[in-house]
């Protein structure tokens, strides 16, 4: 059964109350630079940073299906910030600076690598469909897939040679990104296992800041397939994709388990 978890509501004004004048300036949104399916990116007062805002909109099948998941932006912001902090403590460099309020997070400005990294631990989704195999088979080793980020082309699958030849990243950067991805996978698999969740697969994005490769974007039920270990109930955006219902409750269940584990 999915447990209802009520997030504490934090407004921008209440969040700003504890900040210095300089820190409050960092929280001021300037020009909207980019709007995607689930987030908006704003310029910040300090040009070294962006402000990333999470939305409640949900999309699937390249935007063909659209809807709203109640408080999704709030929940995903919280989950992603908690997981990024945990990864930072484990030695993974990320774009996270600080969570500003319930929907907004301050991140480092960086040049994004236009390649999505998908890591799979269990057969599901397009992997099962393309290869004609059943869902739910535990893989003997993780599978890494690369996709060129291009909405018009529907994010085609590529390999390291495509990325290097097209100049999206050099060979060394791609290899480092893959190595970081595998390390993140090991950390997250153990963490989710401890809270009774199977990390089926997930998507990562990276960028380059001051010559360093940083983990960017988010890690949330929007970008991961998460199944309850006992019931195999889906706790991610597949509930929206497949019209299963209970999306908000599933997302709340994930953040509840994460917070309880990290508060020990």
Residue spans of the language-model regions?
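Short, Lys/Arg-enriched N-terminal segments with co-localized hydrophobic residues
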Residues: 6, 19-26
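Classical Sec-dependent N-terminal signal peptides that target proteins to the secretory pathway
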Residues: 7-17
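Active-site loop/lid in soluble adenylation, ligation, and acyl-transfer enzymes
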Residues: 28-147, 258, 262
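Short histidine-centered catalytic/ligand-binding loop motif
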Residues: 64-74, 157-180
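A short glycine-rich, hydrophobically flanked beta-strand micro-motif that places a catalytic Asp/Glu
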Residues: 98-103, 193-207
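Conserved metal-phosphate-binding beta-hairpin within the catalytic cores
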Residues: 119, 199-217
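C-terminal helix-cap and adjacent tail motif
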Residues: 137, 219-264
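A long amphipathic alpha-helix within ATP-dependent nucleotide-binding catalytic cores
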Residues: 168-200
């Amino acid at each position: 059964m999915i447990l209802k978890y009520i997030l504490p509501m934090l407004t921008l004004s209440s969040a700003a109350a504890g900040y210095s004048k300089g820190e409050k300036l960092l929280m001021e949104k300037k020009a909207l630079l980019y709007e995607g399916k689930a987030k908006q990116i704003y310029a910040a007062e300090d040009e070294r940073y962006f402000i990333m805002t999470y939305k409640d909109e949900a999309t699937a099948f390249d935007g063909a299906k659209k809807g709203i998941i109640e408080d999704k932006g709030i929940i995903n912001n919280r989950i992603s910030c908690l997981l990024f902090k945990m990864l930072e403590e484990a030695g993974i460099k990320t774009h996270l600076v600080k969570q500003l309020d319930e929907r907004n997070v301050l991140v480092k400005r960086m040049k994004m690598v236009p390649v999505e990294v998908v890591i799979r631990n269990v057969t599901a989704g397009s992997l099962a469909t393309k290869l004609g195999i059943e869902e739910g088979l535990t893989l003997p080793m993780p599978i890494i897939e690369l996709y060129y980020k291009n909405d018009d082309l529907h994010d085609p699958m590529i390999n390291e040679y495509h990325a290097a030849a097209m100049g999206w990243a050099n060979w060394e950067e791609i290899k480092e990104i893959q190595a970081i991805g595998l390390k993140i996978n090991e950390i997250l698999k153990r963490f989710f296992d401890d809270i009774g969740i199977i990390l089926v697969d997930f998507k990562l994005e990276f960028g380059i800041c001051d010559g360093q490769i940083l983990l960017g974007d988010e890690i949330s039920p929007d970008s991961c397939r998460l199944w309850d270990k006992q019931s195999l109930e889906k706790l991610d955006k597949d509930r929206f994709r497949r019209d299963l219902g209970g999306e908000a409750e599933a997302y709340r269940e994930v953040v509840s388990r994460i917070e309880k584990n990290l508060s020990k």
